[in-house]
Amino acid sequence: MLDLGLSKMALIGVVALVVLGPERLPRVARTAGALFGRAQRYINDVKAEVSREIELDALRTMKTDFESAARNVETTIHDNLREHEKELNDTWHSAVGGLDGAAGDAGSVGSPGSDTPAAPSWRGSSAALAPKRRNWRIKQAATPVWYKRATTRRTHVQSGAARVARHQPASLRRPTRFF
């Protein structure tokens, strides 16, 4: 910070002794030392804050880069999946359409004016494959047993010594005498 050698420090000390006197010099030196320490702590705090902000900015940029890369991967996967699904549906419809045309029914299969149903999809019925959704209200309404035990009001309070005595085997108990 400052380039103060031993000779410069001694010169400053002598000037301070002459100007302030021997009575006030120790008090001023303590105050100056405390102020210097505070200044150093403040500078170190500012440096640490700046370095944290720089790290946060770097992490934010990394996060945005990662999110954009994930979005790009997701869109490419979805595009490829849609493309392959379209090809599969086209192949399926051409195969099913060829079988229906060979069966002898004239006209287009599944047209709005005809009574013939549309060609089935290769996936089958969507209702049969739909996952059964459970009723989450049942799960939400059930209170866990551990919570019931932890929060219930105790009707029979027992001290630690009484609890130990209650669960101690009879062979280890001391005989009780009243007189």
UniProtKB/Swiss-Prot annotation:
One Gene Ontology cellular component: TAT protein transport complex
GO-annotated biological processes: protein transport by the Tat complex
Key words of the record: Cell inner membrane, Cell membrane, Membrane, Protein transport, Translocation, Transmembrane, Transmembrane helix, Transport
Chain segments annotated as coiled-coil in the UniProt record: none
Membrane topology: Single-pass membrane protein
Protein origin, superkingdom: Bacteria
Biased composition (Low complexity): 101-115
Region: Disordered, residue numbers: 101-134
One Pfam family per UniProt: TatA_B_E
Regions that span the bilayer: 1-21
Main location: membrane
Gene Ontology MF annotations: protein transmembrane transporter activity
Subcellular location: Cell inner membrane
Gene3D superfamilies per UniProt: 1.20.5.3310
NCBIfam families for this protein: tatB
Subunit structure: The Tat system comprises two distinct complexes: a TatABC complex, containing multiple copies of TatA, TatB and TatC subunits, and a separate TatA complex, containing only TatA subunits. Substrates initially bind to the TatABC complex, which probably triggers association of the separate TatA complex to form the active translocon.
Role played: Part of the twin-arginine translocation (Tat) system that transports large folded proteins containing a characteristic twin-arginine motif in their signal peptide across membranes. Together with TatC, TatB is part of a receptor directly interacting with Tat signal peptides. TatB may form an oligomeric binding site that transiently accommodates folded Tat precursor proteins before their translocation.
Family affiliation: Belongs to the TatB family.
Protein name: Sec-independent protein translocase protein TatB
Annotated source species: Burkholderia cenocepacia (strain HI2424)
GN (gene name): tatB
